[in-house]
Curated annotation (Swiss-Prot):
InterPro entries: AB_hydrolase_fold (IPR029058), Peptidase_S9_cat (IPR001375), Peptidase_S9B_N (IPR002469), Serine_Prot_S9B/DPPIV (IPR050278). It catalyses: Release of an N-terminal dipeptide, Xaa-Yaa-|-Zaa-, from a polypeptide, preferentially when Yaa is Pro, provided Zaa is neither Pro nor hydroxyproline. Residues 1-90 are cytoplasmic. The gene is DAPB. Type IV dipeptidyl-peptidase which removes N-terminal dipeptides sequentially from polypeptides having unsubstituted N-termini provided that the penultimate residue is proline. This is Probable dipeptidyl-aminopeptidase B. One of its GO terms (cellular component) is vacuolar membrane. It is found in: Vacuole membrane. One of its GO terms (biological process) is proteolysis. It comes from Coccidioides posadasii (strain C735).
Amino acid sequence: MGVEKRINDEEMQPLAERDDKSRDSIDSTSTASISLALLGGANGSAHGSRAARTRKSENQEKYHDDEEEGDLEEGFVPPAGGWSAPRKVSVIFTLIVTLCIAGWLVAFFVLLGRHKDSSKDAAVSQGESNIIPGIYSGGRGGKKLDLDGVLFGNWSPKSHDISWFPGPNGADGLLLEQGGDRNKAYLRVEDIRSRNPGNKADDTIVLMRESSFMVGKRLVRPSKVWPSPDLKTVLVMSDQRKNWRHSYTGNYWIFDVETQTGEPLDPESLDGGIQLASWSPNSDAIVFTRKNNMFIRRLPSKNVKQITTDGGTNLFYGIPDWVYEEEVFSDSSATWWDGDGKFVAFLRTNESRVPEYPVQYFIPNTNKPSRPSEENYPDIRKIKYPKAGAPNPVVNIQFFDVEKEEVFSVDVKDDLPDDDRLVIGVTWASNGNVLVRETNRESDRLSVVLIDAAKRAGKVVRSRNFSSLDGGWVEPSQTTHFVPADPKNGRPHDGYIETIPHDGFEHLAYFTPMDNSEPTVLTSGDWEVVDAPSAVDLKRGLVYFVAAKENPTERHIYTVKLDGSDLQPIVDTKSAGYYSISLSAGAGYALLKYEGPDIPWQKVISTPANEEKYEESIEKNPGLADMARKYALPSLHYQTITISGYELQVVERRPANFNPDKKYPVLFHLYGGPGSQTVTKKFKVDFQSYVASNLGYIVVTVDGRGTGFIGRKARCAVRGNLGHYEAIDQIETAKAWGKRSYVDAGRMAIWGWSYGGFMTLKTLEQDAGQTFQYGMAVAPVTDWRFYDSIYTERYMHTPQNNPEGYDRSAISNVTALDQAVRFMIVHGSGDDNVHIQNTLTLLDKLDLGSVKNFDVHVYPDSDHSIYFHNANKMVYQRLSDWLVNAFNGEWVKTRDPIPHKSLARRALGLINILRNG
């Protein structure tokens, strides 16, 4: 399904002749062209007639709707015999023409001056372009992308998720396989070595033969499964119901592998609505949370013991509340078993002081019947949502002693106070020791606490002030990796690996013993590791990690020894690549994913240190490659732009039929949030690809200051002042593009979603119509006081400590927004993340400022992803249609809809009056 107003012919692109730069380029064929036509006529030349006819044909292009203007130009073609007018007419005529030219020149230099003013904050230079046309692209002769194909996942590469399973006796290379092959059992564990050619042994362990089972008269169909570590039992969840982004509830069952029968996890509650459940490392117990309280069932007993009793609306045990799920753990679990199965650590969250935000749902929910007489009222869900500056949930780590059946906590000297503590990571070591990573509320002071659960004692072993270091912050992370002692292999003490700032970049560090605050730095250089480490080969003392070492837009896989020596790539680093990896429990095998820039593929391989060599291709995406050959995918031009000393990554998407002699409108797309990255070399066919391929526009993305993998200096520059420098980077990049011969600087737009929506509005506000004429903001933050505390205060401090920064970052200068030709805002009314309060508050400011140059659309009951009731398709269709209208000049016409005579036509009318007078 296409966009109604688009025109797909290649020749319908803007022509190079069009060089006007003004915001109103479409409705100003311009005084200059009118004056030149008049002068040509005065000289009796027929050239003006040919120019007018040529101009008219050009104005019938895709991005123009200038038929009326074409008619005006035709009106200036003189009679074949030339003019025969009294001398006074010629004098007046000359004066009028002179005034026209003078007016045009004044306007030109005023506009030129406007463009220079906002450049004073940045020195701009551009790097060389690295072009990736796409080997498989159908090029100029290919079909244009259609929006439905992009939205419905036709261009999503096929991928296989492999769940590596640690063998009961330390065996490496075991895979958990679920479904997929009707000739095999539904749930099974396979040894990767059995797949080698010539190996006839069947080492498969069957866990579940069928994809469903009966419990009494009830049919159970698994939504998720978790085998026990000894592979004798399977924990099964059915009837999964979504809660927030990562969390869900469901009914839980225990399935016996030997008898192939199941029973309820809690025999006393068949419809448990359980929020979380997890196995003991010894396979002899399951701990779970229901209605915010924790329980444990120790097998083979059928009895369930309640661990906590006061959980409820304000108290959570073992699971995160909304803000911790969203901003800290990115997961539904806040429960951690120790490696020996003797203790369970869990998060206790007290939300009693956290204010509520009511999310209203207006569309009747057939799965949730209303009470009589209330069916015509909105359903309201109240969320404990701490906005910036509001009271936070109070959290602390508690422990459950499995043998003693006791809950306890540990007081730590010099620990952060309750109301100024965020728990951002928990990692068990050996012998009941656990490492807890904490920060203060503003996330710029790190405190690492080592607790001995057996002795019920703890101490702060490491602390760091990131505000003093570089003015930055600590990002929450759950990648800390425990490295157990092994004296025979040169490790006399327990230790751990995590990412730390080192010389301005994020690098790997090995801390040993556990209470050592001075690590061995494993990596260094002007590049950064990514979510590292991926795994540690304990036998060989090798650390596997992913890094943006070759280029910030790329990812390659490396190893380094625990002493920091012998850093080696395990994939080709000579060509551009974006890789990810999932390693087996012993790091002897890996699922290697190549994600771009070419067609993605996947392999299961043995790692270089493994003497048993293995390689199996499990996905080459031939269907995707074949489809790409048939379509006109845009070419990607990667380059850098240096603004105020910061080298930033840019990608430009050009239509496959790109002609450098034509003039193209440009759409900027951004996200831009702190630590994020949008410019990568992953294979991706998305809305931006559709805009370039189908609509024929150029699409540019620049990762500005604040984004990830370009060093802490660039990332931390935005702290306390979100939006300011990021907007400068968008504006300066747009100005640089506007100077290119193939770009129509009079038709430039910007769009983004979420943080990108905020940045769209902030850029339009800061630009005040000088560079960008149009913008589209989806689910935008408009005032950081309205967003959640943990995310916002990490980058902005609290409103109490930085009131001026919050004032500056809010979208408030509606006079500046009014300088754009037009912008659009869309939002889901059921957004639990970026509340519609953001958009409504901005609309009120726009109304108070009598600003009218915007459109707004609300999607009923949609959350932040905007999916409810066909909304996702509709929001992208709306973006596409609106953009076509913008670049066709529809919004320019609405600015001055009253019919009027142009200056030139009035001049011609005056001449006719004088001639006839």
